[in-house]
Amino acid sequence: MADSVEQSSVTTKRISAKGARKRFVGTKSASGKHSQGVDRVGSAAHRPVNQIPEEILKDTKLQEALPENYNFEIHKTIWRIQQVKAKRVALQFPEGLLLFACTIADILESFTGCETVIMGDVTYGACCVDDYSARALGCDLLVHYGHSCLVPIDATAGIKMLYVFVDIKIDTAHFVESVRFNLGAGSCLALVSTIQFVAALQAASNELSKDYQVEIPQCKPLSPGEILGCTAPMLKDKDAVIYLGDGRFHLEAVMIANPAIQAYRYDPYDKTFSKEYYDIDKMHEARQTAIKQASLASKYGLILGTLGRQGSPKVLQTLEKQLQSLNMDYIIVLLSEVFPDKLKLFKDVDAWVQVACPRLSIDWGTAFPKPLLSPYEASVALQSVAWQQSYPMDFYAYSSLGGWTPNNESNRPTPANRRKKNLHTEVIIDNVSDSKPVIKESECGSGETCCGKCTKETDKHSSTP
């Protein structure tokens, strides 16, 4: 439900889908070859490794091929393809950017001579990065458009990665004036958006700070101001939160996490400013009912999402351990998409837990005949954690509540510079007569270079570093 708030009349420039789909025609050299013949050696011999060549940056055909307010970072992409000498490049777009796919593919092929593959499977968010499919198709490089690097580039073994956020320029002045027109000066505001608008958010913050107490919150590893549909910060001492972006999916995440704070939305496309509402009590009631039903289940079904990197094996293992500790019967099912009719086929399963997208349970849980829980809700049902009065929207946050989230400290890989850390520090041990501290085999990272000051034992004694 949204209350439209009066705004000045401003003409919105629309992008023609027809124009975006036209084929790119590159310039030709005297030899009749396309621009892909850009000198890769010559002047590059004295050029810093990461500097984009001038002949790419100043190419007028590139500058005119795509909307000027959408930054597809074409120059950087061409240079990256040349850097890694990629022969086959996979391009992955969210639904809203697919209309530019053919044009971008033509540009990249014309300027680099590579072969491009447009990946057409649905891409809901940054969690859907499909490096597995790209690698299976023999691609050397995957370019993922429209989302931040939720999956680190060093985690995609076997294929190079490039993230293009697609920064979108908006009428920042109109956004700022819309806030001033509707909210009283001196208010404490939090500004959030999707990755496409974080630059505009920073610019707007600088202007709004003259009249308001403005914060751009950060939920690491996300960028300042960035929110996802499953990950949003908990805010303190704020009069309002303003979301810059279209649609409500991402906005609802921050509304669920902060039900007591009034939310507003500014749509940069139609330039409207609206007051937004979310029935948090109805949502809580529905989720608690599902949890209560699942707590009585005799057999669980664990769903691991296979749409890109959506499913987390670490989270799945955490849930398995919880069920095993309770001697619960369960099965594991791999699914790229979760539909009610599919789950109906498993008649002996009493409750489902999906390790894919928490919003699937929140938004669509009531559409399933059996309880469909998120990992957090399953942990409540299995009594591993208490129900939180503020529903946690921390699925990809480093500061998440527990091991039912992928980036929780218990699930993150140990940094390389800490893996060999020697644990020979002060150790306090009770009821041990031997003067040497007892450290478990798995805790000593020294291996054969161990100093011998500890006794590697596996016994009932416990140590507290």
From Swiss-Prot:
Superkingdom as given in the UniProt entry: Eukaryota
Segments traversing the membrane: none
**What cofactors does this protein use?**
[4Fe-4S] cluster
The record's GO CC annotations read: 2-(3-amino-3-carboxypropyl)histidine synthase complex
Pathway where it operates: Protein modification; peptidyl-diphthamide biosynthesis
Tell me the InterPro entries matching this sequence. Answer: DPH1/DPH2, DPH1/DPH2_1, DPH1/DPH2_2, DPH1/DPH2_3
Name of the molecule in the record:
2-(3-amino-3-carboxypropyl)histidine synthase subunit 1
Which lineage?
Answer: Eukaryota, Metazoa, Cnidaria, Anthozoa, Hexacorallia
